Amino acid sequence: MKRIFSLGLGLLMAAAFGFASAADYPTRPITFMTMVQPGAQIDRLARGLSQRMSDILGQPINVKNVTGSHGTVMATELSRSRPDGYNIGVTSLTAYTYAPHHAKLAYDPASFDFLTLVALNSSGFISKNDKPWNTLKEAFDYHKKNNKAMVAMFHGADDRDAITRIAKLEGVKLSLIPSKGGPSVIKAVTGGHADVGYVGAILYKHVEAGSIKLIAAALGDRLPPIPDVPTLREQGYDEQVEMIVGLVAPKGLDADAKAKLLAAADQLANNPETAEFITGNLLMRPVTWGEDHADQTVRELYDTFGKQAAAMQ
């Protein structure tokens, strides 16, 4: 009888502890995973958001860099995490919207909760400042005229495929090098190992320093800090590459954890200092925050990229 009572008491205490743990979320440090190397613009965004969200939630938030395969390595690890709110991705959406149409993945893109979008990373194609071209079109013309292959370092699958399609259109042989994030692209371009590269808003400080130049804005419009450089479409290429960054969690996120994370995100969305950090400090573009908009954006991008992939077959 004593043993049965002890066992029952133990189960009751365990249940009570489990309930308290869920209701008191967070009770321990949280991890923000990101798919780029330290120092990359999305890494800086993740660290800035981690500090601000930590102040709201009352627990430390550590940043873990999980690089490789354009974000799919990080997405795989995140998909295998418990949906308890202690592992959250701060990542480009391409691993969930673009990659599923072009590679066999170890995860289902439907196995995630998309909590909110946080920023649109300003992005473009760059070259070393002393290269004899000032636009991407001129770069291809130069390589075509001199019968040379172009070496390009890419950031993700979408910009890789965009530059591949452009090279095919121009009739220029392309040699592709994968990267682990913006800093590695900058290093390759300035070191003369790549003729062109694709990066996010990290490009601004290097353009200002004079080590690189922007040769094509990759978004739908020109980048305001460098307004004289035309977009891909303005250079005659029907291409656009957008690096939208969001907060992502494993599917089936604990309800209390989800509510508190969404509430914290809502506070950040309405905080002028956070907006200044994203748009003024990081020079990223503002987006609409919120779970509904994130879900809609992911669905629309997934469908768009699916149709694009089908048309290419």
Model-derived features: positions:
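Short coil/turn segments
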Residues: 37-39, 93, 128-133, 154-158, ...
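Short beta-strand->loop
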Residues: 108-118, 153, 173-177, 195, ...
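N-terminal (or domain-start) structured segment
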Residues: 22-111, 146-148, 158-159, 168-198, ...
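A short C-terminal helix-loop "cap" of Rossmann-like NAD(P)-dependent dehydrogenase/epimerase domains
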Residues: 27, 54-58, 224, 234-243, ...
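Short, low-complexity disordered leader/linker segments with a strong preference
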Residues: 1-27
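An extracytoplasmic/periplasmic, membrane-proximal ligand-sensing/linker region
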Residues: 27-29, 169, 255-313
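Hydrophobic packing residues in well-ordered alpha-helices of helical domains and bundles
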Residues: 46, 203, 294-298
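Hinge/capping helix and adjacent helix->loop/strand transition within the periplasmic-binding protein
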Residues: 53, 77-86, 100-184, 242-278
